[in-house]
Amino acid sequence: MSGFVEKPEPVQVPGLTHLHTGKVRDLYRNEAGDLVMVASDRISAYDWVLPTEIPDKGRVLTRLSLWWFDQLADLVPNHVISTELPPGAPADWAGRTLICKSLRMVEVECVARGYLTGSGLVEYDATRTVCGIGLPEGLVNGSELPGPIFTPATKAAVGDHDENVSYEDIAREVGPETAAELRRTTLDVYRRARDIAHGRGIILADTKFEFGFETAEDGTERLIIADEVLTPDSSRFWPAATWEPGRAQPSYDKQFVRDWLTSPASGWDRASEQPPPALPPEIVAATRAKYIEAYEVLTGTNWA
């Protein structure tokens, strides 16, 4: 089993229609037809959305995405219209809410990898390829790749795994021109972010983006980057000072949560069909601190 341990009820706000409850974000539509995206403090691990929230996590993700959108503005436009709180919205939505353009979304997770780890490592160990891209012998967990690669995946529902697919599969799905634009833009954004992060002592190992098309009045379309960008939820950030290929790398993400859930202390058997337990306060505090540290190191600004 997988999914929500306790699925939250959507907040009812006058003038907003609830569309979707995701792992982290709740999506609404306002009366103007724009999307209202609210980043919650929910956290997921091992395909479960956990019953315990991480305070301020949604605000960290939102503020960090906005910072990255500014760094990327000359490469690709983004979907943000406003950060104003909708009338009648709860006060807790402040700092975690974006009013966004309604786009024709491309149903592809656009993943860029500069280092070998995660599902890419599993595939490489079996085939010496990742998403059909041949890689040299001798790579290990954490190895830097000869150059960044585009490794798309199909988007999965809550509780399911995204599935890695080849570029050729994506080209058949969305058309060769769109596939080429997705690959080019994904790798351009990755390279920009990689270089910015490197200057702050951070390795951007891999990351995933979502894109959609905005239609102009004359019927032409342009590619827009959407959802979140370059956050600890969508990316693997490693401290460069401790990078050592051949082992799992320390990271700025929810590793505290994963480690505790798979430890004897949790009492949870991942192989069972039972949902995971609530997180203890010390794991919540350590995870919150790690998200805030990622924000502060990447942006060079204090969270408070």
UniProtKB/Swiss-Prot annotation:
Alphabetical list of InterPro entries matching this protein: SAICAR_synt/ADE2_N (IPR028923), SAICAR_synth (IPR001636), SAICAR_synthetase_CS (IPR018236)
Pathways involved: Purine metabolism; IMP biosynthesis via de novo pathway; 5-amino-1-(5-phospho-D-ribosyl)imidazole-4-carboxamide from 5-amino-1-(5-phospho-D-ribosyl)imidazole-4-carboxylate: step 1/2
Catalytic activity line of the entry: 5-amino-1-(5-phospho-D-ribosyl)imidazole-4-carboxylate + L-aspartate + ATP = (2S)-2-[5-amino-1-(5-phospho-beta-D-ribosyl)imidazole-4-carboxamido]succinate + ADP + phosphate + 2 H(+)
Gene Ontology molecular function, alphabetical: ATP binding; phosphoribosylaminoimidazolesuccinocarboxamide synthase activity
A single GO cellular-component term on record: cytoplasm
EC number: 6.3.2.6
Keywords, ordered alphabetically: ATP-binding, Ligase, Nucleotide-binding, Purine biosynthesis
GO biological process: 'de novo' IMP biosynthetic process
Family: Belongs to the SAICAR synthetase family.
Name of the molecule in the record: Phosphoribosylaminoimidazole-succinocarboxamide synthase
Classification of source organism: Bacteria, Bacillati, Actinomycetota, Actinomycetes, Kitasatosporales
Gene (UniProt): purC
